[in-house]
Amino acid sequence: GLVQNEKGEYLFIFRNNHLDLPKGHQEEGENLEVTAVREVEEETGLKDITLGEKLGVTYHTYKREGKRELKATHWYKMSSKSTEALTPQEEEGIERVEWLSEEYLSEHKKEIYASLYHFLRKHLKI
């Protein structure tokens, strides 16, 4: 999810030497909206999330058990008024969770996966 706080900052995770947005796999019986909110909560520790509009779908490949897999990610706009401490889901390889400004993201675009950066440019001023 693309989560914005009241300061206009966006929630990012840092994993595998890259900035990324929280996301994950849909569990059986879940709809996409429930999955999106649950994954943000699990990966970041953020509570009090308000789900907004669907922003689109992106695709990327990754290796799983030696095979290339294609993953579709359904992105949603979200917001939160929470000021509580964030908790990275370390078992998922997430090293830290931070609220970042559009200015910071513009200055650190090399730390963002190219496919995600392309998506972010459509929705943020970076």
Walk through the language-model features, giving the residues of each.
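Phenylalanine-focused residue identity feature
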Residues: F12-F14, Y104, F119
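Unchanged
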Residues: Q26-Y113
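N-terminal strand-loop-strand
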Residues: G1-P22
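A short local loop/turn or secondary-structure capping micro-motif enriched for an aromatic residue
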Residues: L19-P22, G29, L116-Y117
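Charged phosphate-binding loop/patch that engages nucleotide di/tri-phosphates or the phosphate backbone
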Residues: E111-I126
